[in-house]
A protein has these predicted regions:
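Sec-dependent N-terminal signal peptides
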Residues: 2-13
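General marker for long, soluble alpha-helical cores
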Residues: 14-220
Length: 220
């Protein structure tokens, strides 16, 4: 019994030391202590810890007052919790993926909602593409595309079965259209119409359908 209790404690101490090592010399001691506490608790709940550590380092590098850095780290934890909840509502398997949670938190920070996260999670796309979709959605909102147009564009692209590379190209394509004089919303709407047309035509070759049977050899 004592051994079974000692193992989690040993892992906890090792994790805390690892976090402390990453922060050593980069943040003040009080920020390091709070970051270690928040990150250790987050890890115990299956949340990623890198966003918390990065926020501590970023704030300290900018000489932000300690109380503001602490508030920012707590907000990161809140966003990670909300992202995990949204993923859980849409696809329970994704809620255990720390990369997906971090991507969801990024999208929430940009201005999407927990419901939006759930919608993307249940799109039916492979997990890796959902993660890309979350990051692209957050980037689009940060570029000024309204959340509703962002969701229409990203979900439409996912449902059309387009590859991850095309998802990653969406922010650049929106910026290119904006440079021609349209608004971010108009640019996204135009791209969404193209994605919807692709969805009606079906997935591109090699996606969403079984490979063709090989031609049988001729009879001797």
């Amino acid at each position: 019994m004592l051994t079974s209790l000692a193992l989690p404690l040993a892992l906890l101490l090792t994790q805390q030391q690892s976090i402390a090592d990453r922060l050593a010399g980069r943040v003040p001691p009080d920020i390091a202590a709070l970051a270690t506490e928040l990150a250790t608790d987050a890890a115990g709940r299956g949340l990623p810890i890198d966003p918390i550590i990065q926020k501590a380092i970023e704030g300290s590098a900018k000489r932000v007052p300690a109380e503001r850095v602490g508030a920012a780290m707590r907000l990161v934890v809140t966003q990670l919790d909300a992202a995990a909840g949204g993923l859980r509502d849409g696809n329970a398997a994704l809620s255990a993926d720390t990369v997906a949670i971090a991507a969801g938190a990024f999208a929430l920070t940009a201005g999407l909602s927990g419901r939006d996260i759930a919608t993307l999670a249940r799109s039916g796309s492979p997990p890796a593409e959902v993660i890309v979709g979350l990051r692209v959605a957050g980037t689009l909102v940060a570029l000024g595309v309204p959340a509703s147009e962002t969701m229409t564009l990203v979900t439409g692209t996912l449902q059309a079965g387009r590859p991850a590379g095309e998802l990653l190209a969406l922010p650049g394509r929106v910026q290119a259209e904006v440079a021609k004089g349209v608004t971010p919303a108009q640019a996204a709407a135009g791209l969404a119409r193209a994605a919807a047309a692709q969805a009606r035509r079906g997935p591109p070759p090699g996606r969403g359908q079984p490979p063709p049977h090989p031609t049988p050899p001729p009879h001797p």
